[in-house]
Amino acid sequence: ATEDGKRAVPLKDYRNIGIMAHIDAGKTTTTERILFYTGRNYKIGEVHEGTATMDWMEQEQERGITITSAATTTFWDKHRINIIDTPGHVDFTLEVERALRVLDGAICLFDSVAGVEPQSETVWRQADRYGVPRICFVNKM
C-alpha cells in the first residue's frame, strides 16, 4: 500500500494466471522466461541446473520436476500478474486442483513433439470444472 493507505496497483488490475501441462512440457521453463522478459528476474533460471525461481524445494531441484504449486508476482503495463506454476506429474494432480480455484485464466502448454499428453487432458478437464479460461501455448518447436 502507498502512504495514503491505497493499493499501489488497484485490485481490478490484478491477474492470477496458472501455467499447466503434462510433465516436461516446459511449464517452469516458460515461467522463467516470463519472469525474465517482464523484468522480474535479471537472469533466466534453468530447471535442470536447479536454478529455476519456481522450483524452490530441494527435492524439486534434485528431480528436475515441480512438486508443489509455486506462486510469484510480476508486472506488465499497469497489471500485477500473479503466476502460479503447477506440477505436471499425475501424482501431484491435487496441487493443480487447488490452484485452479483462484485463477482468472491459465496458459496450457503443449509439447509440439509429444502432442497432447494424458496429464494435459486431465488438467484441461479440471479447468473446465472450474470454468477457467485458457490460452494454448505450443512449446518446443
From Swiss-Prot:
The keyword Ribonucleoprotein does not apply. GO terms for molecular function: GTP binding; GTPase activity; translation elongation factor activity. Gene3D superfamilies: P-loop containing nucleotide triphosphate hydrolases (3.40.50.300). Pathway: Protein biosynthesis; polypeptide chain elongation. Pfam families: GTP_EFTU. GO terms for cellular component: chloroplast. This is Elongation factor G, chloroplastic. GTP binds at residues 21-28, 85-89. GO terms for biological process: ribosome disassembly. Keywords: Chloroplast, Elongation factor, GTP-binding, Nucleotide-binding, Plastid, Protein biosynthesis. Chloroplast-localized elongation factor EF-G involved in protein synthesis in plastids. Catalyzes the GTP-dependent ribosomal translocation step during translation elongation. During this step, the ribosome changes from the pre-translocational (PRE) to the post-translocational (POST) state as the newly formed A-site-bound peptidyl-tRNA and P-site-bound deacylated tRNA move to the P and E sites, respectively. Catalyzes the coordinated movement of the two tRNA molecules, the mRNA and conformational changes in the ribosome. Belongs to the TRAFAC class translation factor GTPase superfamily. Classic translation factor GTPase family. EF-G/EF-2 subfamily. It is found in: Plastid, Chloroplast. Residues 12-141 form the tr-type G domain.
